[in-house]
Amino acid sequence: MSKQNRGRLIVIEGLDRSGKSTQCQLLVDKLISQHEKAELFKFPDRTTAIGKKIDDYLKESVQLNDQVIHLLFSANRWETIQYIYEQINKGVTCILDRYAFSGIAFSAAKGLDWEWCKSPDRGLPRPDLVIFLNVDPRIAATRGQYGEERYEKIEMQEKVLKNFQRLQKEFREEGLEFITLDASSSLEDVHSQIVDLVSNVNIHETLDVL
């Protein structure tokens, strides 16, 4: 399939309560309003058997060791990826609310080895564009429903932020378009910036892999 016909793979990352999920939905709605084919994928996908186990963990209903939950997060991405490939090949732009970068950033924040955290996701498709919504963890902590899940603690989020900054540096050196936006701007302004970035992204004929 030519690069003109395949869909784009767009990832939006961010700290918890950064407005990421809202922006993902706004982007999908915008693309559809422009008569483009678009679909939203949220990770973790809490509807699968693996995703339900992750959901229990995040809500602190069960305890799992850090290596186990990291591998479950990765498996949750792998179990969906074939369908994502199929959609992209049909010309559907796939918008991902979190991806492998979150897995690395959060697990490394708990002290797991950096390269080990990256290894389970090697072979997943490399996005055409990654957008990181940057917000001060202390501001995110003031937003509604903050603290309902395991990782929503300021100290943890500060470590995750540093890891995202490291990921951006590493992957940009590998040629990945990895852009940071200030998520403290208005919802409309952030949305407008995201739409501009997505509209102008350069795509290769086929997706590379991580």
Swiss-Prot record:
Residues that hold ATP according to the record: G14, L15, D16, R17, S18, G19, K20, S21
Domain of life: Eukaryota
Any one Gene Ontology BP term: dTDP biosynthetic process
Reaction equations catalysed: dTMP + ATP = dTDP + ADP
Keyword line: ATP-binding, Kinase, Nucleotide biosynthesis, Nucleotide-binding, Transferase
GO molecular function, one term: UMP/dUMP kinase activity
Enzyme Commission number(s) of this protein: 2.7.4.9
CDD domains on file: TMPK
Metabolic or biological pathway: Pyrimidine metabolism; dTTP biosynthesis
Record's GO cellular component terms: cytoplasm; cytosol; nucleus
Statement: the UniProt record of this protein carries the keyword NAD: no
One family name in Pfam for this protein: Thymidylate_kin
Cited PROSITE patterns: THYMIDYLATE_KINASE
Entry-linked InterPro entries: P-loop_NTPase (IPR027417), Thymidylate_kin-like_dom (IPR039430), Thymidylate_kin_CS (IPR018095), Thymidylate_kinase (IPR018094)
Family the entry assigns: Belongs to the thymidylate kinase family.
Functional description taken from the UniProt entry: Catalyzes the conversion of dTMP to dTDP.
NCBIfam families: DTMP_kinase
Name recorded for this polypeptide: Thymidylate kinase
Organism of this sequence: Schizosaccharomyces pombe (strain 972 / ATCC 24843) (Fission yeast)
Protein encoded by which gene: tmp1
